[in-house]
A protein has these predicted regions:
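Active-site-lining helix/loop region of Rossmann-like oxidoreductase modules
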Residues: 151, 159-181
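Amphipathic alpha-helical segments at domain termini/boundaries
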Residues: 17, 56-74, 143-147, 152-158
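Short glycine/serine/threonine-rich phosphate/pyrophosphate-binding segments
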Residues: 13-15, 84-87, 106-108
Length: 181
């Protein structure tokens, strides 16, 4: 069975974990606090309604509260956008794992690792990749089978979709200001 580590079980961590679980991976999730597995099950059901996983068999999930217990494996970091916390976790993981960050606001230079950014919600089927060792992200083949679109970017700060979103938000506030809402 293919294996992948997911660091943190927040908004994106749950979605990424459910996606790879449904793709048949053994998911090793690290989260400091105890997980609500019901939230994971809800995410699985939602993804099954949105994406056809009929060509895949469900995987397995293991949950760890100590990062040292994770297996040496491909790892996706999906922590909150806290640079110091991300750096601390990356330092622990980097020796024995291939680590990709799902950060949407930091740059590759900030974390010194490659990025794989899944968009929220994950069933949008859009992934932004940036880095110099992208061939090490072996699940791309499975994601492409599901119809995910892969964008390779230069790794500027913030994901491409976030840059579009910030522009929309800025336009929204300009309209409010202009028309005195």
């Amino acid at each position: 069975m293919k294996e992948i580590n997911i660091i943190d079980f927040g908004l994106m961590g749950k979605q990424i974990s459910a996606l790879f679980y449904l793709l048949g991976y053994e998911i090793d999730v690290y989260n400091k606090s105890k997980l609500n597995i019901y939230e994971f099950e809800k995410q699985i059901k939602l993804l099954q309604r949105k994406i056809d996983f009929s060509n895949f068999n469900a995987g397995k999930i293991n949950i760890y509260q100590h990062i040292e217990d994770l297996k040496n494996s491909l790892t996706i970091e999906s922590l909150n956008e806290d640079l110091n916390l991300k750096k601390e976790i990356m330092q622990i993981l980097r020796d024995n794992n291939i680590v990709f960050s799902n950060s949407s606001s930091l740059s590759m230079d900030d974390l010194n690792c490659d990025f794989i950014h899944f968009f929220n919600t994950i069933y949008i089927k859009l992934i932004e990749l940036c880095g110099s060792n992208l061939e090490r992200f072996t699940p791309l083949k499975d994601l492409k089978k599901l119809g995910f679109h892969i964008i390779c970017s230069k790794g500027n700060r913030g994901a491409l979709a976030n840059l579009l979103l910030f522009n929309e938000i800025s336009s929204f506030f300009k309209i409010i200001e202009k028309y005195d809402y």
